[in-house]
Amino acid sequence: MTTSHILGFPRVGAKRELKFAQERYWRKELAEQDLLDLAKALREKNWKHQAAANADFVAVGDFTFYDHILDLQVATGAIPARFGFDSQNLTLDQYFQLARGNKDQFAIEMTKWFDTNYHYLVPEFQKSTAFKANPAHYVNQIREAKALGLNFKPVIVGPLTFLWLGKEKGEAFNRFDLLNQLVPVYVEILNALVAEGAEWIQIDEPALALDLPAEWVEAYKSVYAELSKVNAKLLLATYFGSVAEHAELLKALPVAGLHLDLVRAPEQLAAFEDYSKVLSAGVIEGRNIWRANLNKVLDVLEPLKAKLGERLWIAPSCSLLHTPFDLEVEVQLKEKNTALYSWLSFTLQKVEELNVLKQALNNGRASVQAALDASQAAADARATSKEIHRPEVAERLANLPKGADQRKSPFAERIVKQNAWLNLPLLPTTNIGSFPQTTEIRHARASFKKGELSLADYEAAMKKEIEYVVRRQEELDLDVLVHGEAERNDMVEYFGELLDGFAFTKFGWVQSYGSRCVKPPVIYGDVTRPEPMTVRWSQYAQSLTNRVMKGMLTGPVTILQWSFVRNDIPRSTVCKQIGVALSDEVLDLEAAGIKVIQIDEPAIREGLPLKRADWDAYLQWAGEAFRLSSMGVQDDTQIHTHMCYSEFNDILPAIAALDADVITIETSRSDMELLTAFADFKYPNDIGPGVYDIHSPRVPTAAEVEHLLRKALNVIPKERLWVNPDCGLKTRGWTETIDQLKVMVDVTKKLRAELA
């Protein structure tokens, strides 16, 4: 019989129950025991869903109050020493302080979990880090599952991935040197799981899909030689990419089974066809929302079953953490777009798809014919739907003139034409885009969406807010103004709602980090722009002032990265479609007299593939899509872009190739370190490094802003330097915003006078 299992499950609950409970707990509106009880009930529901879908094991230990890598820091005694907490006796309050900071210590740094939109808390390793086992997190969840009479499989991230994901702090050393101290602690944790009756233990090593240094790869041999001494069968789980290059190493490891992601990297199966142990085939997409074509999946699985027999296991490609909970609650979507609804599959539907595959493998396809027919019908309808496939979109992309993504003239010529009409002072000041989204703005938007506020009244409220933003900027004496984006709920959702080819769910939430969830748009069809999206708002804002008003758009790569993307054509094609659609908006803005236009790309680095060999291809099409979004503009129209905090050093040629006239970047928290790379590279165009951190309500001192600006002037010619905050001001309050911007403008004027 074929075994089916789940690698991990969403934690937040079908209706984000955990999020709301956490936030009430943080506001001291919910007792700790009530939060613990709610979490226990959520775990039980998750396990019962898995059991109801006929999974042979339920995943245990994957549930977390904030982040599974933070749980591992606690379990191994590796929490940051700077907090002064005892990892063996950590309270729930202290656990949350690690994640959120307290009055004495900033929070543990967060970063993206591989190339997903989930964020983990980055372990801080020191030369003196002393690991100590505390398996309570896993043991307690095992006991709950046992009490329910469920067959369970603990899930834990492996030691090499855990160490790889961390950072060295304090005295210089290599965290790899900690491995020998970490492994015995892992053995102790695994033994505690065995003592609770664990027969199989899933150890996740997604780092194997990265470009690991040779010594790290080699270490898998000795590490797993030690771990395999525990009295349980180990399933080594890999995902997010191919591990074929390590096939010989992995086949020789003393583990009882291996999980492969056959959705992201189906071609790697060939390298493991002679594997002699359990092979877990990850065949249901764990990080996108499309229904599988089950007949096609069975075409792959049936020959495997013939070869492996009971050694074949089936599973989703990775944890289902990255997919929304239940499609069935999307009643509005079903009514509005029945076809699209039939092409989707959320977590509960995915475990059912897995169950159908299991029945087909064990009892033949005829035993689940109705389910297979429904799956095939959905796949066939999707392949031919006129709602998805618009010939005019493909034709437009195919017939773009050669060099469509290139500006008419080089930057050196464009900037002369731009400066002639802009007539800006040295060190021009501007904002990144958004201004505070007040309670009044949110209330007006909610009332309008509920039908309690008419369109005319809603637009009047937004115009009033835009005028307020313009007047404040004039009073502050900023040079290039923005309209503040009062009318936008979210920088991607706003455009998705106005572009064809996008759809939205009501409950399609996925965890981004901690209690923060996001509801990504669904790109299901060819993308077009039926009518102008931002022009009238920017025109209205410009009508209020004689100063230059900047148009604001979200770029194609960011829209792609922060959406659930169709999987029937290449991502590169989808991205270029978005770029071309945005170009229509850019030309309309230009025609309306808006001749400074910002196209935000905060997510361009996030899209980098896990393996460096694939970077060039990605950067090539991402850059082309960005440039297509401003194709056809005149030389005297100034294109800006903004990028959030990033390591740019290794992709600077690609950033320069975007050929934006002005790039603004988030640099204040790194003390302008990023700028050195731009200077060394001799970045050719204008640049606006952020001079204060908008993530904090704190008002910077004049000395701090001056220090950063002087550092910037040391490496960027004064003629090419702009002055701006790090990011948009959406999450700030008005009082601190005015105070912060005043400091920025005053310091700029002081330096201007000095440089004149």
Swiss-Prot record:
Binding residues annotated for Zn(2+), in chain numbering: H642, C644, E666, C727
Record-annotated disulphide pairs: none
Residues reported to bind L-methionine: I432, G433, S434, E485, D600
Enzyme Commission designation: 2.1.1.14
Record text on cofactor binding: Binds 1 zinc ion per subunit.
Residues annotated as the enzyme's active site: H695
Ligand binding (5-methyltetrahydropteroyltri-L-glutamate): R16, E17, L18, K19, K112, R516, C517, W562, E606
SUPFAM superfamilies xref list: UROD/MetE-like
Enzyme class per UniProt: transferase
Entry cofactors: Zn(2+)
Binding site for L-homocysteine: I432, G433, S434, E485, D600
Biological role stated in the UniProt entry: Catalyzes the transfer of a methyl group from 5-methyltetrahydrofolate to homocysteine resulting in methionine formation.
NCBIfam families the UniProt entry points to: met_syn_B12ind, PRK05222.1
Name of the protein in question: 5-methyltetrahydropteroyltriglutamate--homocysteine methyltransferase
